[in-house]
Curated annotation (Swiss-Prot):
Reaction catalysis annotation: 5-amino-1-(5-phospho-D-ribosyl)imidazole-4-carboxylate + L-aspartate + ATP = (2S)-2-[5-amino-1-(5-phospho-beta-D-ribosyl)imidazole-4-carboxamido]succinate + ADP + phosphate + 2 H(+)
Signal peptide, first to last residue: none
Pfam families linked to this entry: SAICAR_synt (PF01259)
Protein's UniProt name: Phosphoribosylaminoimidazole-succinocarboxamide synthase
Keywords, ordered alphabetically: ATP-binding, Ligase, Nucleotide-binding, Purine biosynthesis
Pathway: Purine metabolism; IMP biosynthesis via de novo pathway; 5-amino-1-(5-phospho-D-ribosyl)imidazole-4-carboxamide from 5-amino-1-(5-phospho-D-ribosyl)imidazole-4-carboxylate: step 1/2
GO BP terms: 'de novo' IMP biosynthetic process; cobalamin biosynthetic process
EC number: 6.3.2.6
Keyword Membrane tagged: no
Length: 230
């Protein structure tokens, strides 16, 4: 069974699945779209490094093995149709909704849930919505929230070793065959905001037409390789 999304192809084979990263990059609920040769392999390896780091922190992810150049062997999950966002600083849609300055600290990590629905522009929902709509139980939502904060603080610590700031990050979770909440999808410049002394190292370069996003994505991969080898 195969499934193709905007940036990945999923192939389920027996007890495992293969997650193949495409070279596509999108923004604005898919309205902006380009193909950047090499992006898929960069995001796949970045994800593999960061998920391996998380597993060393006793955090469950779907990663089994990185198959160069652009494929991850993963545990199949029954995915929640959600994006779980953790914000450490004000940025993006948070500033548009609530005001404030980009890069302003939040007093505590803020967790937000969004239903994956491009036509409705990924509506933000609360835990009660998730239960009423049959998307997740309150217990599952709390597990996702708890895991998302733990993962974010671990990644914040990882990047701080090189004086990079993690501003916010988006996750997708699913259930394994035993009903455990497990981190799926990817961790890459497609899914987080990463800054260094005001310089942007994430998809905002593409969203805002600030230059070559592939160059920044490569620099993030090199950073992850370097930090991983320390």
């Amino acid at each position: 069974m195969n499934y193709e999304g905007k940036t990945k192809i999923v192939k389920v084979t027996g007890d495992y699945a293969l997650l193949e990263f495409k070279d596509d990059i999108t923004a604005g609920d898919g309205l902006k779209h380009d193909v950047l040769t090499g992006k898929g392999s960069i995001c796949a390896e970045t994800t593999a490094i960061l998920m391996k780091y998380l597993s060393e922190k006793d955090i469950k992810t779907h990663l089994v093995e990185y198959i160069p150049p652009r494929t991850l062997k993963v545990i199949p999950l029954k995915m929640f149709p959600l994006e779980v966002v953790v914000r450490l600083k004000k940025a993006g849609s948070f500033v548009r909704r609530y005001g404030g300055a980009e890069g302003e600290d939040l007093p505590v990590p803020l967790v937000e849930f969004f239903i994956k629905d491009d036509e409705r522009h990924d509506p933000m929902v609360c835990v009660d919505h998730l239960e009423i709509l049959g998307i997740a139980t309150k217990k599952q939502a709390e597990k996702m929230k708890e895991a998302a904060v733990k993962i974010t603080l671990a990644l914040k610590e990882f990047f701080e070793r090189a004086n990079f700031e993690l501003w916010d990050i988006k996750y997708e979770f699913g259930l394994d065959k035993d009903g455990n909440v497990v981190l799926g999808d990817e961790i890459s410049p497609d899914t987080f905001r990463l800054r260094n002394k005001g310089e942007i190292f994430d998809k905002d370069v593409y969203r805002r037409d600030l230059g070559d996003p592939l160059k920044k994505y490569r620099e993030v991969l090199e950073l992850c390789r370097s930090l991983n080898s320390q």
